[in-house]
Amino acid sequence: MLKYIRDEKDMFYLFSNEVQHKDVAESLRATVKSAGFYMADGEDSLAYGKSPSLDIGALPDDIVLIKQQMAA
């Protein structure tokens, strides 16, 4: 499992579960549109949950956009 942040330009940043969402958001200096957790098992993947440190959750289209960016 990884954590992720989506910024206002719909760019995704995946990072270790050991790092807090708020720390990554502060280092990016970007407006956070969504944040949550990413899990992949073969072809199946899921973006879900909510960042407690940002009080921002996943959006329904996050997984679609993450898959598109990873395929590019």
Summary of predicted features, one role per range:
Residues 1-72:
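Intrinsic low-complexity, intrinsically disordered or marginally ordered coil/linker segments
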